[in-house]
Amino acid sequence: MLPRPLRLLLDTTPPGGVVLSSFRSRDPEEGGDPGGRAVGGGQEEEDEEEEEASVSVWDEEEDGATFTVTSRQYRPLDPLAPLPPPRSSRRLRAGTLEALVRHLLDARTAGADMMFTPALLATHRAFTSTPALFGLVADRLEALESHPPGELERTTGVAISVLSTWLASHPEDFGSEVKGQLDRLESFLLRTGYAAREGVVGGSADLIRNLRARVDPRAPDLPKPLALPGDSPADPTDVLVFLADHLAEQLTLLDAELFLNLIPSQCLGGLWGHRDRPGHSHLCPSVRATVTQFNKVAGAVVSSVLGATSIGEGPREVTVRPLRPPQRARLLEKWIRVAEECRLLRNFSSVYAVVSALQSSPIHRLRAAWGETTRDSLRVFSSLCQIFSEEDNYSQSRELLMQEVKPQPPVEPHSKKAPRSGFRGGGVVPYLGTFLKDLVMLDAASKDELENGYINFDKRRKEFAILSELLRLQKECRGYDLRPNSDIQQWLQGLQPLTEAQSHRVSCEVEPPGTSDSPAARTPRPTLVITQWTEVLGSVGGPTPLVSWDRPSVGGDEVPGTPAPLLTRLAQHMKWPSVSSLDSALESSPSLHSPADPGHLSPPASSPRPSRGHRRSASCGSPLSGNTGEGTSRSAGCGGGVSGPGSSDCRIIRVQMELGEDGSVYKSILVTSQDKAPSVISRVLKKNNRDSAVASEFELVQLLPGDRELTIPHSANVFYAMDGASHDFLLRQRRRPSAATPGSHSGPSASGTPPSEGGGGSFPRIKATGRKIARALF
């Protein structure tokens, strides 16, 4: 770095700019502003010629207060220059309430301890009341009436400045309870003549006028509740009617209004942590309103997924709408999409409300519904859960709050790139629970008073640092520009959330504990495309018309009872629409079923809904008979037919497994032309929660009409070895070698009895029968 005289001679600074020659970060508590700039005209120039040598810290006791003194000894860069005197600064660490007020009204505090005044005004309710603090200020001024005029004028000027700052930053502190203290202050100003004086105390008249406007018996304006009395309960499943981004914007609008009305000082751990104590129900109304909104959003998620509406406080005072797993999966996907849109809007309060509701026990245990949810939705849900992970003290959510929103470039009103539905600029709504937890933990970890009875003001400084972050976020929250939507807000107002007991009972009715928690229910089932199960096709193509999920029904063109809609969906590999396609359909088609119509949620109950888990394609292309009446009258036990060229290479079989005293359980298994008996046996064992390693100890037996059995050889291909007359099988322990049981078959060569006329045989037996016929004819 060039010496200062040489820098002054060589003026190389370009016009309108400044050359940075050196810098040193400063403590904002030690005479500098928060940006690190020193207070004082020539302080920077003096610092350029010095470098810090040593720092000493010690405590001092003075008039009921403990100060932390920091002394910095600087050494000049010029070794021949004399050593300058050390620079000292004092911070109040602890003291009595009277000592805090004296330090507050000390004219030197503004420059030496900048953060003391805002920290005291923001946190004083944790250890005293506003009337008590205001009264001590009036006492201090009255005690100085006999002092020299200069000291009285300086102290009065500081008091007017402090009270003006107090009124501007915390107007909620001034209510009817401080009327007596205000009268004392006004009397003091009139008595001493400062009320009409200009200059340092010239703002006293305006201060008294503004304080009088605030000090009245009127109650503060609280946020309006969301639920209006007399409204009819809304159907929670109507969430499917609204677009996800529109619903997210309305939630953000409500959350932003509540967050802007939040009083940060009411979040203090000494206040919020004691809210449940007797006589404290009136504390922290702005925080309670925010928490109520959070719980209402979470309750809306639980109610809609369960399809239940509360009509009372009792566990059974609930109206439940019957929903099947595919329908609940659509609701899960919808709320995941809403949470993602809230994340894009930086509304972390509603994001966590939706995520916590989906993670709650009544919803998380619905494994059948989660199994029907698309992988994309599950991936988005996992990323949202990661945002609020407790790892590293919610580090990821804190980092997202710290990120600044890049200003959007101006766009034309009719441009295709214009922001959607009123979102302009960038705001933020934090999840308040993170800050409440920090403040409660800080309150529990630090003592309110030291051993000598002094107020621990270092604790209040740490609390004020957290409150300052809330104040910063409130300023950023004003960046929203959203418009209310009456339909969505009316629906939100009409929701009646379930109690914890009600939601648990409804969830257990939807999926009893034995089914949802079993290992079999936790195993994802593959998606199957069925073309040879005539019973299912007949039931789908029966008298109930099929409702397409891909687009609204236009009615009239499709004849009820035909399987054509199902074939169309099978050709599309059963791709159910995501939430985005649902939104577009709802927006574009006025012919969509109304929310009260259960048909708009899913296919009819007779249609088998494949799992949304792991999709698996199967080459099943055999044509179906156009005679639907024949298809509906057939049973699964007599369908099928002989495999051959042009027919399907996969079948659905029903396997019964003997479980001893527990009875029998049937499982449906997809058998392809490549499956051997051991692989089929292993899959059946896995589906019945048995060890597949013992597959060699079991045998697969086909149950034929007339109480006959066909034992599938262990090395045979099940698809070709089975009799086409039946799809029913039995899995049992392998029997020891013994005489064949009359009426049973152990394979093609075990019996000379030909297959029954009504059903087809296996391919080797068909060839043997053909040879016999040829020999008889020729």
Swiss-Prot record:
Record field: compositional bias (Acidic residues): 43-59
Ras-associating domain boundaries: 649-736
UniProt domain Ras-GEF: residue ranges: 243-513
Any one GO MF annotation of this record: guanyl-nucleotide exchange factor activity
Pfam families given in the database record: RA, RasGEF, RasGEF_N
Chain intervals with Polar residues compositional bias: 620-632
Role summary: Probable guanine nucleotide exchange factor. Putative effector of Ras and/or Rap. Associates with the GTP-bound form of Rap 1A and H-Ras in vitro.
Record PANTHER family: GUANINE NUCLEOTIDE EXCHANGE FACTOR, RAL GUANINE NUCLEOTIDE DISSOCIATION STIMULATOR-LIKE 2 ISOFORM X1
Name recorded for this polypeptide: Ral guanine nucleotide dissociation stimulator-like 2
Native source species: Mus musculus
